[in-house]
Amino acid sequence: MDFIRCHVAMQIINFKALEIDKRSLLGILVIKNIKNLHRSNQLLTRLSDLMVPSVIHNGEFVMRNDKSDKLWIFVGESWASLDLEDLNGVRENVFNISKTVPLLIQG
């Protein structure tokens, strides 16, 4: 299984302000540079399974996926490695972040 670094920028879907305590930071998925993925809905579905569930709290790209509420949040950029096979056949189409989401961390 080959892993690579790639670039990502996407639209925010179902965005709203969140209040998160430190214990729930482990639920935040952080990625950077996932590039050339197509069709945002398919992209989000694939990313939810591909992203490394770890916190790189560098203030760049922050994503939280709450499947129960269908909540997706994207802010800035960060890094992660993806399986190369999952990026096969991907088109040159990058979705840019269009709105900011306030992310409140408490605790």
Curated annotation (Swiss-Prot):
Source domain of life is Viruses
| Protein name, entry field | Protein beta
Species assigned in the record = Bovine ephemeral fever virus (strain BB7721)
Q: Which gene encodes it?
A: beta
